[in-house]
Amino acid sequence: MNEMENTDPVLQDDLVSKYERELSTEQEEDTPVILTQLNEDGTTSNYFDKRKLKIAPRSTLQFKVGPPFELVRDYCPVVESHTGRTLDLRIIPRIDRGFDHIDEEWVGYKRNYFTLVSTFETANCDLDTFLKSSFDLLVEDSSVESRLRVQYFAIKIKAKNDDDDTEINLVQHTAKRDKGPQFCPSVCPLVPSPLPKHQIIREASNVRNITKMKKYDSTFYLHRDHVNYEEYGVDSLLFSYPEDSIQKVARYERVQFASSISVKKPSQQNKHFSLHVILGAVVDPDTFHGENPGIPYDELALKNGSKGMFVYLQEMKTPPLIIRGRSPSNYASSQRITVRTPSSVNSSQNSTKRKMPSMAQPLNESCLNARPSKRRSKVALGAPNSGASISPIKSRQSTPMEASKENEDPFFRPNKRVETLEHIQNKLGALKNQCPDSSLKYPSSSSRGMEGCLEKEDLVYSSSFSVNMKQIELKPARSFEHENIFKVGSLAFKKINELPHENYDITIEKKSMEQNYLRPEIGSRSECKTSYGNELSLSNISFSILPNSAENFHLETALFPATEEDVPRTFSRILETGSFQNYYQKMDAENADRVYSKGVKLIASGTLPSGIFNREELFEEDSFYKY
């Protein structure tokens, strides 16, 4: 309480301001990433923070209406040749992509494309009358008025530095996304037309399909070869345009500011640029002397190889534009507060932030001085000075009883899902020490009340955290695998890697061997086939194992000599380095009951070797056999 009363009110105000700024930042983050605004023509534009959202270059979300244009001045009047009526001209430009309105400034990026479209209109003359008429420029030269015949009207764009009024180069790219070709935006011949809506420009921006292009053909082009020539005179303006397909809309797409502008340092004072749209008339250079300094003009190189003069009629420009030379992530908005504490502290201090004005209890300064993070951490950070470790594995929530039990159990490991042998031994050893009468078994119900003993739920061992002792499989010292047993005909062979000890009692494994031998016969695999005679009529069979054989089988040769009728047969399946031969012999009936000390006798055709071997019939060495 004394510490709360001695808290400095100035420090309290600082802490309150920090949390207020943090709260405003969180509210700012909760605002929609993409803001939709209604344009004057009824279409919509999508505005978003490029530091938060990355959009593909060809995405329609990149299209948004940019800064408005303002009139610079009118230069030279245009009159109709026969009537002398002055033509009322007006440029209608619009930026459809590339600029964002940030902090009351229009901001663009040097490496990003921008799209500018423009048309012009004649308020006192419709399109049909405009194309059938001819027009002249009124040029005053030394108080003498002269007229220059207009060949056609056109529009061009350029950029200027507002600080020193120098012209900045613009670069336009083709539709192919490669390094070239690059060229300066050209002069675009136009006829009067209304400006298409922003949505149409957005939809037609990346159209390359011929069928879809025909949909917008009437919007963007006037085809001279589709009109009736009889309605137009020889000196009409329609025939003076350079091409049959005359554009109605000047579309400057995929335009960038040239890399020569120096805007690489975000810390330096922002340079302002402006885009200019100029409507002009192309006239014959032989008739234009250029003596009037008040009328600007540019020389043109026409497609037919001749030259032309582009005389300025009207000019419009944008408000000052900030062109940034680096990516949006390098520029921080002045309205954005970056002070932020870790997300875990935010979640743990929610109640404190709501009651901050009353300052019921002092705040932990170490939490407030935490380093601001650029993004919210996905790992929950523990409270300061807390010794409890948080498991990275998500599990079900524990009840209060289970939580207290976990704290009491000295062997509880919340972040281990499988019991190890060492942990089992430690747990059983602890139970044995606490319950000496129970030996190595679970404690009785009377001993479970003892502090430190496991509850009933722990004795069963949850399958999600441990392994039940009853589920541990105890295997014999020697196991005979099924894969080492081969059944060929009426014989079953088992491959062993080494001989058992001479004192080893094979009867221990007799039952398991008999069960293993009762496996189905191996299909018709070619490597398991053997060629043998009609062994069903034979009483005895003997095998000779090569001395260099690395495989040992419990088989011995018969004591009787082989006859001339013995036919050797060879197994087609060879196990590693082992080779085997069997000899089928025909025996007389009187020899059927003869007892051989070390012979192998077949009782019936289906008898397995496991039913014939005796306990004492074992090899002493790998290469020593008794005959």
Swiss-Prot record:
Q: Impact of changing residue 59 to A on the protein?
A: Reduces DNA-binding by 86%
List, alphabetically, the InterPro entries matched: Fungal_trans_regulator, NDT80_DNA-bd_dom, NDT80_DNA-bd_dom_sf, p53-like_TF_DNA-bd_sf
Q: Which GO terms describe its biological process?
A: cell division; meiotic cell cycle; positive regulation of transcription by RNA polymerase II; sporulation
- Result of altering residue 50 to A: Reduces DNA-binding by 70%
Substituting residue 58 to A results in: Reduces DNA-binding by 65%
Reported effect, residue 111 to A = Reduces DNA-binding by 95% and abolishes sporulation
Q: What result is annotated for mutating residue 254 to A?
A: Reduces DNA-binding by 93% and abolishes sporulation
Which signals induce this protein? Induced during prophase I of meiosis. Requires protein kinase IME2 for initial expression and continued transcription during meiotic divisions. Can autoactivate its own synthesis.
Q: Where is the composition biased (Polar residues)?
A: 327-351, 386-401
Q: What is the effect of changing residue 110 to A?
A: No effect on DNA-binding but strongly reduces progress through meiosis and sporulation
The record gives the effect of mutating residue 57 to A as: Reduces DNA-binding by 65%
- In the UniProt annotation, what is the result of changing residue 113 to A? Reduces DNA-binding by 80% and abolishes sporulation
- What does the UniProt entry list as the effect of changing residue 202 to A? No effect on DNA-binding but strongly reduces progress through meiosis and sporulation
Task: Summarize the subunit comment.
Answer: Binds to DNA as a monomer.
Stated role: Transcription factor required for successful completion of meiosis and spore formation. Gets activated after completion of meiotic recombination at the end of prophase I. Recognizes and binds to the middle sporulation element (MSE) 5'-C[AG]CAAA[AT]-3' in the promoter region of stage-specific genes that are required for progression through meiosis and sporulation. Competes for binding to MSE with the transcriptional repressor SUM1, which represses middle sporulation-specific genes during mitosis and early sporulation.
* Name of the protein in its database record: Meiosis-specific transcription factor NDT80
Q: Which organism is it from?
A: Saccharomyces cerevisiae (strain ATCC 204508 / S288c)
